[in-house]
């Protein structure tokens, strides 16, 4: 099932030199976001840089949100991860998509124009309504915290 999402091209190179974000295979969950920068840039170890993707989206449907997630190869091979770990795009946001790149490695990393930096994934949203209670019904886990599940 495909859901239409409005996209605005902010960088004219998208659609001509670089493709719009798209699913690589029928089973892909995410679409690659690219670095739409003017020139190559270096990210020093420990440094974080905010990189434009050249697009804006408007999800519009309050039952959906978008998340920006890291690409596994960049983190594993080069230490490049998202500076905010995950980017959450609310359904009513209409501004440019940016990727926060953090170099947690020990060498500078060069980002080239058009490099694939992150993935955009759409997820369902459930808005909760809190119900105040004095006690919870008993559960198997109870109040066991970090590292508690699956232990005897």
Curated annotation (Swiss-Prot):
Recorded family membership: Belongs to the dUTPase family.
Cofactor needs: Mg(2+)
Assigned EC number: 3.6.1.23
Statement: the UniProt record of this protein carries the keyword Oxidoreductase: no
Organism placement in taxonomy: Bacteria, Pseudomonadati, Pseudomonadota, Gammaproteobacteria, Alteromonadales
Annotated metabolic or biological route of this protein: Pyrimidine metabolism; dUMP biosynthesis; dUMP from dCTP (dUTP route): step 2/2
Catalytic activity line of the entry: dUTP + H2O = dUMP + diphosphate + H(+)
Keyword Hydrolase (UniProt): yes
Purpose: This enzyme is involved in nucleotide metabolism: it produces dUMP, the immediate precursor of thymidine nucleotides and it decreases the intracellular concentration of dUTP so that uracil cannot be incorporated into DNA.
Organism name: Shewanella woodyi (strain ATCC 51908 / MS32)
Pfam families: dUTPase
Sorted UniProt keywords: Hydrolase, Magnesium, Metal-binding, Nucleotide metabolism
Protein name per its UniProtKB record: Deoxyuridine 5'-triphosphate nucleotidohydrolase
Record-listed substrate binding positions: 71-73, 84, 88-90, 98
GO molecular function, one term: magnesium ion binding
Positions of disulphide bridges: none
Class of this enzyme: hydrolase
GO biological process: one example: dUMP biosynthetic process
């Amino acid at each position: 099932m495909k859901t239409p999402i409005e996209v605005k091209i902010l960088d004219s190179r998208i659609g001509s030199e670089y493709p719009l974000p798209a699913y690589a295979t029928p089973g892909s969950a995410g679409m690659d976001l690219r670095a739409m920068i003017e020139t190559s840039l270096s990210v020093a170890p420990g440094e974080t840089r905010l990189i434009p993707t050249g697009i804006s989206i408007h999800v519009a449907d309050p039952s959906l949100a978008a998340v920006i997630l890291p690409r596994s190869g960049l983190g594993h091979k080069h230490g490049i991860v998202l500076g905010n770990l995950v980017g959450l795009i609310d359904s009513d946001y209409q501004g440019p998509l940016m990727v926060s790149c953090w170099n947690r490695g020990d060498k500078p990393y060069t980002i080239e124009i058009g490099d694939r930096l992150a993935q955009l994934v759409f997820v369902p949203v459930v808005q909760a309504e809190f119900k105040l209670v004095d006690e919870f019904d008993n559960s198997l886990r109870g109040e066991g915290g970090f590292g508690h599940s699956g232990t005897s």
